[in-house]
Amino acid sequence: MSWGIAWPWNRRIVPHSSACGERRWRVESVGVAVVRKMDKREIAKILEEIGLLLELKGENPFKSNAYYNAARTIESLTDDVTELIASGRIRDLKGIGLALAEKLAELVGTGRLTYYEELKQSLPPGLLEMTAIPGMGPKKIRAVWEKLGITTMGELEYACVENRLVSLPGFGQKTQDKIRQGIRQLKRRRGFHLYANVIGEAERIVEVIRHSAEVRSAELVGELRRRLEVVQTISVLVSADRPQSVLEGLRQMGGLWELARAGDRIIGKSPLGIPVAVVVSEDMSAHVLLTATGSEEHLSELAARAARMKIPWNLTSDLGVKLAPKADSEEALYAALGLPFIEPELREGLGEIEAAETGLLKPLVEAWHIQGIFHNHTTYSDGSASLDDMVVAAKSLGYRYIGISDHSQSAFYANGLKEDRVREQHAAIDGLRKRTSGIAIFKGIEADILPDGMMDYPDEVLARFDFVIGSVHSRFNLPEEEQTARVIRALVNPYVTMLGHPTGRLLLSREGYRIDMKRVIDAAKQSDKVIEINANPHRLDLDWRLCRYAKEQGVKVSINPDAHATDGLEDVAFGVNVARKGGLEASEVVNTLGPDDILPALSAPHH
């Protein structure tokens, strides 16, 4: 007779006697066929992760400790663990009960463990990754997840930047600083680094080399000279007769480690563990500088152009110049190919040579072109500096206006402003305007774009602001069509001035949400809206590749620091890098306008 019940494949019912002599039945595990022989460390790691996942879920500590103890037991085994599991003898070990033995049997018998996979699926995947951060145990991870909605390492790092952890119970400033430092350490181990985390150290190394004996000149080259947002190596080109003198100078600098020399090359690691590659050349010729800067794609296109023009051209990637036109500068090298000088930031092999050939390359925007800055937070929401301090800092940097834009009411995690606090802040700005000269102060808001594309204030509230930045801060996982429609609907709102951090990405940490940015840029053109280049070095969003499309469509950008402290105002320089890589001129960046011209240019309906 069949009852329609599938009995587990690795269990059987056997008779046994109870303590009082009664005949009863019990379930026992039987031997299993091994699908894949597993190392004890593999099995222990899975058990350890199950313990972590249970802690992250807030399960009974006894339950998670059982898995931790089992992991330690298995890792200490000298016998073949797979054989012990397959034979059922694993139950002889202390702490391995029937339920756990059955899970281990499933693991080696099928190559997977349903319980483990279901546990992982029940939690955001980024939570487990965060356990690798020093100082971030399961309790703290659970706290930032439940209190701040943080589910990835990138979001956690950005929350540290925004100073949002200090107010959580059990955290504080020191803990926040330690967490941020730990995240950086993890990223370094993975081999990629934010430009902003590298450039300061790289410039110090170059300065030390320049002051070394016998050195004529030294320049950053490669990814850093091209100002890529993410880099792997600090590459330096040095003009000197003896590589040994350069090596000695680096040794005297201190902090560099694993320094070694092979011929004209010196390698090592910076104090932060970033690979350093120094090439010493007797003469830093234009040919060598061009080649060391790259990119490979750009150099390849130059070589192809030279071949078509029948010009001798054979620059090698190992910096051994075999054949090239005579030139005393990079400008002269490009001129030999009938081209104007191409700025290093543009040399990515993405159409810059064709643009130069047809006269489309214009002078790029410079940091000094920026007249004022939008997207600045204060202590009214999640900033760490007061309104007064942010204005004073912006003025000291030479800006002629600053736009204050704290978070809106939906951003509860960031102390977003309800309508009464909007009125309170506006009154404070009015008072500050009266006692401040030399800088204009604009009233703004970073308003959440709700999932349906509506803004989280009614129009009568939005009308009170000088500018409105619309940003997505929730529901990142919407399908592409829905996310795109959501953002486009926000751009149609007559009170929205610009789109903030348009893809939501966090470099090296979180991919942007699925969105058709070309359609969004087209919509910005139709509604005459500005798109932000968020200059925070963790974002740099709009990406420079998309800046090129915005340029083609005639859509202007605003380079905004997204500052949450006074030092964050200085991030504008990183946004300028993005704009330059995107080929943007000063006239294509809206905040190169002065204070009298900027608000009309933002097309707000009440100006």
Residue ranges of predicted features:
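Core AdoMet radical
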Residues: 403-404, 445-446
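Tryptophan (W) side chains
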Residues: 3, 7-9, 25
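Short, Lys/Arg-enriched N-terminal segments with co-localized hydrophobic residues
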Residues: 25-37
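Accessory alpha-helical DNA-binding modules that contact the DNA backbone or grooves
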Residues: 37, 61-266, 273-275, 286-287, ...
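Charged, compositionally biased N-terminal leader segments and the immediate start
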Residues: 35-59
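Charged catalytic cores and adjacent phosphate/nucleic-acid-binding surfaces used
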Residues: 36, 227-378, 386-402, 409-439, ...
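Conserved HRD-motif arginine in the catalytic loop of eukaryotic-like protein kinases
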Residues: 14
